[in-house]
Amino acid sequence: MSSSPELGGVDFFAHGGLPVPQVTILQAERVAALFGLTVQAQPLGSQQDSNFLLADGGSVLGVLKIANPAFSAAEIEAQDAAAAHIAAACPDLRVATATHGPAEVPVDGGRALARVLRFLPGGTLAGAGRYLSPRVVAGLGAVAGQVSLALSSFEHPGLDRVLQWDLRHALRVVDALAGHVRDEDLRDRVTAAARAAWNRVEPLAGRLPWQAVHGDVTDDNVVCLLERGLRTPDGIIDFGDLTSSWAVGELAVAITSVLRHAGAEPCSVLPAVRAFHDLRPLSAAEAAALWPLVVLRAAVLVVSGEQQAAIDGVNDYVTGALEHERRLFERAMSVPAEVMTGLILAELGLAGEPLPTPSGVVVDLGRCAVLDLSAQSDAVDEGAWLEPGLEDRLAQALLAEGYDAVATRFGEARLTASRVLADHSPATVATGIDLWTAAPVEFPAGLTVTGEGNRVHVSLPVPDAPAVPPLVRPEYAKGWLALVADPAPLLGLPTATRPDEGDLLKRRAASFAAVQEHYYADPPRIERGWRHHLAATDGRVYLDMVNNVAVLGHSHPRVEAAVARQLRRLNTNSRFNYASVVEFSERLAGLLPAPLDTVFLVNSGSEAVDLALRLALVATGHQDVVAVREAYHGWTYASDAVSTSTADNPNALATRPPWVHAVDAPNSYRGRYRGSEAVRYSADAVLLIGELAGRGRPPAAFLAEPYYGNAGGMPLPDGYLAAVYAEVRRHGGLAIADEIQVGYGRLGRWFWGFEQQGVVPDVVTVAKATGNGYPLGAVVTSRAIAERYRDAGYFFSSTGGSPVASVVGLTVLDVIQDEGLQANAARVGAHLKARLEELAVRHALIGAVHGSGLYLGVEFVRDRGTLEPATEETMAICDRMLELGVIIQPTSDRMCVLKIKPPLCLDVAGADFFADALDRVLAEGW
């Protein structure tokens, strides 16, 4: 089996089209037999070669690659040598090296070289309907960087070839093949885009380093390690496009492939660019050439796909890719190359000097007011930012006050330009200044002025810049703002300063204890809330599905007014005699059944649980407590001692003091007893309490959430609390219901969680919802139990029950009643749960939907039989949901449950937006 004697490299322009060699499955199996392999062959898609997966029973032995007859022996040898070279240089990178061959074999139309390559399990990133996360995109860039570094020292005669995929020839390829594009409009746009991109690359060409390049480090050829539900790029296959070309082309080809994926847009490639740059630093010239090369690659893919389909119409791999290539091209063209280049340079720290600040006032505006439209502006309070025409009304009001002009701020992210329930960021960042003037103003040449009437937009673009819109999306702001200068100095206004949002996280890490964690690795900066929405400083508005603290909704005007009014009058400690503490205590006790009639007021849930336990210890004289596993109750010594959730404290079980005794979490979905067997949980708890009493250690209390909140809102088994409460009371103990998460109407049907169980506890703890974000908690018990606390001394909390805290508590109860929030929780919660249960029918990852009202949980499992928790997938889903405009977080000890605890003002539109976003994520990936 000798190699082909032909040594010259292929020349695409001489060969024209390269149809895939027609090889049947039987022929492929016969070729494999030449290498001593008895296998079953399965065809794989390819653009120019004929590929087959070779298997022996259930074992994959390799991939048979029969090269296009146009490729010489030297080219094939170079490919195998390059693969071996990379494998040696990058031991952590899996590489499809040759295991057998090459050998010359007959094919339809001539003879070709065949060999068997190592099979890399795990699958590729391919699939245009599949979403690629920033982590995966960065992994793609890292693979491209590793390959580029390794090949920088590789040389071989077989690199001397002229390929249509070599970006040095991109414009020539487009010109040669554009005639195959039947859609005239598309053809014209592709050729124009290629010409414009080439005009940007050509002046840089002399500064772009050459080397050996793989040429096809794309989603089709990067293989992933699949571990714990997540993909990590760690392998490379298919060296068929190996050649010598611009080194930066390796990255351009890689990131172009990202654009065909679900949800991708130009800024989606930045993690790959950064990862590549970290391994193989790009020069400023390479960074400047990168996006034009992406456009050229996209244009080549479109024309090549159309040409290949024309000459190889039976190739499903080719014809199926046409629509994806067109979509990829449209996305590459959706942002001007100048903007993407500026964005890339800024991301890599390669941007040149900022545009010079213009000097000298050229327009005298007189007395001018500056209008703040950011998320932190008082002008957008109480949801005013959602009102159409707010900017004009604010400006006209200032003009009416006597100002000669009103101006907005350059580079500011305007909350007034945002919108709610949006799956992508709107254009919020100003590229100029809007002006309202009391009298007409003459503007000199050099300023770009648009608009009519007494409102105009003034900008100062650089020469030859593309048309700059007045507002741009925050993801692209650095690119757009590199094309415009701040016109403020020319208008006699102060120059705007743009904060570095990353600096805030650094300052937090330096001054704020790191154990006080924040949501998300790269969190948005949230500075405003309204109802069930949270607004970031870049103008993006998120649907808040996790913030059960703001039970009424964020920034409720009645709470704000009540606090301000009371602060103007009095705020002191609860030892003084004032009405609000009495009124709130009466109202709260009035919501509970007898004999729960006496209230203690504290500042938090942790304090409430701590006090409840102290009450039980003093009232009973007992020293032990029974608590439920996988629960969280607080951070004080006592409340932490009974917190058994390993998600909140990995050492919770090992460090539990001897006076705390844990019973199994009554989880009817994945616990020891499931379904109808779940009634046995209460028997086990009763047995433990009896055993403790038999050893002379009867418990002072049994503490549990009456609705299993930490598991994602799961009801306890029927009769569970009735049986356990009866047993603990039989031995002189108290029943404590922790309502901090689940109470206050959140469950919809029941105001208190214990109502679902048909029981009355001896002590109830509440917090979170009681203050709608203001620090307020309470313990409610009977007069007899409360009086026993005197045996341990007196109780006092400086700000617990303060005038302001008490007024807040009263206002929250008023709003819950006046706005029908419990009924809303029942209605919207039922709608949302039905939507989620419908998703569970279509998406196997959803194992169960738990909960009631607006305390719901979606539990993700990898297998509905074994219930293996999908922990990593859940966190990745939360990250993707954030990108789509939803704030959601995981819960449970396995961190595989989405905890759905939004403000009770959530409406059906918000519920549907959440369900639709989750459906999209589960369909497209995370």
Give the ranges of each region predicted by the language model:
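An alpha-helical support segment within catalytic cores of ATP-dependent transferases
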Residues: 21-32, 153-156, 172-215, 225-228, ...
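Active-site activation/catalytic loop segments of kinase-like enzymes and analogous catalytic loops
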Residues: 247-281, 295-313
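Conserved N-terminal phosphate-binding loop of PLP-dependent enzymes in the Aspartate aminotransferase
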Residues: 496-926
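Active-site acidic catalytic loop and adjacent metal/ATP-binding pocket
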Residues: 44-58, 63-64, 98, 198-249
